[in-house]
Amino acid sequence: RVLAIDANPDRGTLAERVELKSDRTVRDVVKRAGGITSFTLFSDYVSRDKSRLDVLASDTDPMLSEAFDEGDYNVVADIATRYYSICLTDCGTGIVHSVMRAILQRADGLVIVSGGSVDEAKLASETLTWLESNGYGDLVKNSVVALNTATYGTQLVKLDEIENHFKTRVRAVVRVPYDPMLAAGAVIQFDKLHPATRQAARDLAALVVDGLVD
């Protein structure tokens, strides 16, 4: 079983990538943590897509999502690890928010997403530097960079340069080719992605699993 948790403190949109089957959020899990005593009960809080990925949504109210802190995340993660073999956390860009501390302390590895432009790659590289400077150097070494080609016609020479840069800093780099379904920012149907996109996703998933600590 695999669960994706949206812990983005800036109003996450992860749940918008699957067809919602539950209107409950991480806040509901925190409120009712004591009563969630089985996988069946926890399943009421998640949405499951056709690939059998379970997604736990964040709050749509930015004020509530901002208030989701490290203590709340630990409550959710403690419950999730009872019922799932792998827990993925979408933490957005709020790297100094308190929830990030709990996420990073529990993580076995990181996936850093970078766009194909120089500016986007610079921001991703600065994130790696921040992590190294704040005691997470081992996590950086075990990280995978997903080089996301969000716009059609990105220069391959530029992508080669960006990929080579990240290869000096992290364990692996995966290129995710342009795909209109990903670019649309709506519900993602894995079987309708381009074949090259599906293969990139499989490669990324395999690399993440390879990096898990026993």
What name fits each language-model region?
Residues 185-214:
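NTP-binding/hydrolysis catalytic cores, primarily Walker-type P-loop NTPases
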Residues 48, 54-99:
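Phosphate-binding/switch loop-helix module in NTP-utilizing enzymes
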